[in-house]
Amino acid sequence: MIRTMMNAKIHRARVTESNLNYVGSITIDADILDAVDILPNEKVAIVNNNNGARFETYVIKGERGSGKICLNGAASRLVEVDDVVIIMTYAQLNETEIADHAPKVAVMNEKNEIVEMIHEKENTVVL
């Protein structure tokens, strides 16, 4: 059986920009992407902690060290600058792969700096 499991999470990032007139996507600082192993063009699920919106888009690599989290195109209607978001990817794994799977979680501060890295196993709680 194949199951869809969380693979990476950027936890409590702050939206730094919103660009309605761009084609689409979310732009994320390349350092953050590297830390959680998210690739450009990879599909992401996004949760806006401020208004409860949930949506999907794809990733564009942003300037390294910028802290940039920019929602582009139609998705920009679902956020405001300074909103807190959670950005996640998922992987499809078989039962054997699940046993060793440990998602990478980057916990962010208000400046979009990584303050903690967690290699999450089941029943891990991040506040």
Swiss-Prot record:
- Indicate which residues the UniProt annotation says bind substrate: T57, G73, A74, A75
Q: Posttranslational modification, per the record?
A: Is synthesized initially as an inactive proenzyme, which is activated by self-cleavage at a specific serine bond to produce a beta-subunit with a hydroxyl group at its C-terminus and an alpha-subunit with a pyruvoyl group at its N-terminus.
Keywords from UniProt, A to Z, are: Autocatalytic cleavage, Cytoplasm, Decarboxylase, Lyase, Pantothenate biosynthesis, Pyruvate, Schiff base, Zymogen
Q: What is its main location?
A: cytoplasm
Q: Where is the active site?
A: S25, Y58
Cofactor annotation remark: Binds 1 pyruvoyl group covalently per subunit.
Task: Give an example GO cellular component term for this record.
Answer: cytosol
Q: Which Pfam families match?
A: Asp_decarbox
**Functional pathway:** Cofactor biosynthesis; (R)-pantothenate biosynthesis; beta-alanine from L-aspartate: step 1/1
> Which SUPFAM superfamilies has this protein been placed in?
ADC-like
> Pyruvic acid (Ser): which positions carry it?
S25
The processes (GO biological process) annotated in the record are:
alanine biosynthetic process; pantothenate biosynthetic process
What is its cofactor? pyruvate
This enzyme's EC code(s): 4.1.1.11
Q: Which domain of life is it from?
A: Bacteria
Which Gene Ontology molecular function entries are recorded, alphabetically? aspartate 1-decarboxylase activity
Q: Does the keyword Cytoplasm feature in the UniProt annotation?
A: yes
Q: Which reaction does it catalyse?
A: L-aspartate + H(+) = beta-alanine + CO2
Gene3D superfamilies on file: 2.40.40.20
- Entry's InterPro entries? Asp_de-COase-like_dom_sf, Asp_decarbox
| Subunit (UniProt) | Heterooctamer of four alpha and four beta subunits.
Q: Which purpose does this protein serve, as stated in its record? A: Catalyzes the pyruvoyl-dependent decarboxylation of aspartate to produce beta-alanine.
Which PANTHER family does this UniProt record tie to the protein? ASPARTATE 1-DECARBOXYLASE (PTHR21012:SF0)
Q: Which family does it belong to?
A: Belongs to the PanD family.
Q: What is this protein called?
A: Aspartate 1-decarboxylase
Organism, as annotated:
Staphylococcus carnosus (strain TM300)
Task: List the gene name.
Answer: panD
